[in-house]
Amino acid sequence: FSVIIILGGMKVIGFTDVIQVVVLIIGGFATTYVALTLVSDHFGLGKDALAGFKQLMVDSPKHFNLIVDKPTEQSTQEEINKYLMLPGIGMYLAGIWIVNLNYWGCNQYITQRALGADLKTARTGILFAGFLKLLMPIIVMLPGIAAYVLYKNGALQEEMAPGGNFNADNAYSAILGFLPNGMKGLSLAALTAAIVASLAGKANSIATIFTMDIYNKYMDKNASEKKLIKIGKITIVVSIIVSLLFTWDDLLGIGGAGGFTFIQKYTGFISPGVFAMFLLGMFWKRTTGSAGIAGLITGFVLSVCLNKYAPPRFRHETF
């Protein structure tokens, strides 16, 4: 994987993305179909995907709600925890749009993928990617809900709780195991390719930022293009070694929380400040670089303070 990125750069990442997304979509629809037929068959409705979907709506209607109900004094701790993860309509008014606009619009790792041969190509690519994103509830969420319903009703006991230890992260793989052998292998290969492509994009982004914004700007302003490419490749190797060191013996303390959850928590400390800096920089001409840095630092400090002091003060109170 590392050798491929070092030798190929964004060109390899682009080709890999195109291939793996096609396979992922096909495998995703196949997994959803299998999940829904498993539900319908378990409830004696035959192998009917539509009947399986209707059964999900009947059995677990709250899993299809966009807004989680606010907990009451009689609510269980599980219900409170779910609400804290998706805290009502306030999340949509004051949280998600900031995180999403920051991730999709102010993140070099993402914006580098939107570059095209011309403006029209770039715009078309972004719109097409947005359309594919709309498929996520079908190919990702439905199999997870199906696994939940099946487990709750006595199925998938061994798959979801190997050795008697329940793990919700096993939901998708539990459904994936029922795919035909060829499709199962294809889906696993696509998932692996997606992971590799994602890591490749991050590594390339790290190399670009260090080479162009740090090395070429402050360390060697007259560096040739050939030297910059060499520095970029060295940066990729160093970043991969550093990442391996941090994963050794769980140095970051991620534990069983999962890497994605861990990363989202801590990037959330800086995303509001970064987004505000970009927003003001685009629409207010009097914004300066110093003001942007000050806003970024202030936003980070406020986020850390809110994370530490707001939960004990407000508990699950929001609107």
Predicted regions and their residues:
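Membrane-embedded helix-loop-helix hairpins and adjacent transmembrane boundary segments
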Residues: 1-319
